[in-house]
């Protein structure tokens, strides 16, 4: 019974995330009502609130699903390719308003920064010396740079593939971080 229940929970959460994705392509995020998400996902209000406190929590959960499960423990840029691939799938089927993208990418930037900051702090445990770059600064820099690269890619409708954009992003970050570590104060 437990396995069957887990599948139902996963199915419900997936349906809700897909409904939200479809709706953000049709209208501004701020104008989407929970009722619209429920109708699109064929989920009851009580079921929705069993899983999420509101549409913001649903949104953050979807972003975390991509960010937090991608390449943990590797380079601070390991989240990039899965997010670019996700956007590539959706940029072929429709566009969202600039206002919605700003709202969503603000949340994405915050989640990326949190993940990088946590990973950087974990990797420094027991080292004893100050890192070349403060973890908070590195996290904010990498996350903000990613959003700039992502927005440029989407705005220009660049023909570069997700893999190529990942290489561009990683190169920008590596160059900047390496330069910061070798530059004298």
Predicted regions and their residues:
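Basic, helix-initiating cap at the start of DNA-binding domains
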Residues: 1-27, 31-32, 36
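Hydrophobic alpha-helical connector segments
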Residues: 71-109
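Secondary-structure edge/capping motif, primarily at the C-terminal ends of alpha-helices
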Residues: 91-98, 123-126, 153-157
